[in-house]
Design a protein with these regions (language model features):
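C-terminal binding/interaction regions
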Residues: 2-10, 14-15, 93-150
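Mid-chain, well-packed structural core segment of small domains
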Residues: 67-113
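Charged helix-capping and loop-helix junction motifs
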Residues: 48-51, 90-92
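Short, solvent-exposed amphipathic alpha-helices that sit
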Residues: 17-28
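A short beta-strand-loop structural module common to alpha/beta enzyme folds
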Residues: 32-43
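Short active-site oxyanion
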Residues: 6-7, 61-65, 84-86
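Short, structured active-site "lid" loops
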Residues: 49-67, 71
């Protein structure tokens, strides 16, 4: 069972409704939830909220992050610009679980316009319950973090 119990969530205007539901769901599961916004459906810039989530992880205030926008793609692109962040855009439970087990992802990005609420909850549950295996997977992560030597 995963012991990482502090989760930071952020969203833009296209993901705010699902983010709020995920916050409540994760609290019910016993997680400490940090909600960095947005709190409105007024148009806003998703990189602002990706930065807030990534900075919260970088300072050690949270163990895992969740970003929600329309598709999850823009958030994942923005989040992966930050040192130490391994963000994956997932639309199914298998990918969400394996990105933790094999890629040691610390941020999952999902799309409110892509997923229904039930599937979104299942994806997040798969992500937060999985743990990194290490071993050969750590070697591969080191390769993309430090560059590949041929």
């Amino acid at each position: 069972m995963n012991t990482e119990r502090r989760i930071v969530l952020g969203a833009d205007h296209a993901g705010v409704n699902l983010k709020e539901k995920l916050c409540a769901h994760l609290k019910e599961l016993g997680f400490e939830v940090i909600n960095v916004g947005t709190f409105s459906t007024d148009s806003c810039d998703y990189p602002v909220y990706a930065k807030k989530v990534c900075n919260t992880l970088q300072t050690g205030e949270a163990d895992l992050g969740i970003l929600v926008c329309g598709t999850g793609v823009g958030m994942s692109m923005a989040a992966n610009k930050y040192k130490g962040i391994r963000a994956a855009c997932c639309s199914d439970t298998f990918s969400a679980r394996l990105t933790r087990i094999h890629n040691n992802a610390n941020v999952i990005c999902i799309g409110e316009r892509v997923l229904g609420e039930g599937l979104a909850f299942d994806i997040i549950d798969a992500f937060v319950s999985a743990e990194f295996e290490g071993g050969k997977h750590q070697r591969r992560i080191s390769m993309f973090e430090n560059g590949v030597e041929e």
